């Protein structure tokens, strides 16, 4: 009988991708066997910062090319969360980056519902995409 493959999901805008994202993805990959990256869609970028710096399909293509990534999933959500995407994927683990924690995560409810383990604080907050592009997050 074969062992269960542990799937780890992470999410991000990757707009643009930077070294902090790579650190986050490398740490997440170590948590399981299969790394699934949810890339936030263009609509979510508009909600966060007014407009995407890069198109969602370009961001998906770049993330797919990374060695540590096993699968890329374009977010199906219409708000800033990835709750619906997690409901579709149903990974074993949902990992947040260094600047996100379960206590402030909109995904915590869906993770409890589907018994998805949450892991927080992966990688350091080295820099932000908005600091690279000059685009500011909309609060």
Residue ranges and their predicted role:
Residues 1-139:
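Nucleotidyltransferase catalytic core that binds NTPs
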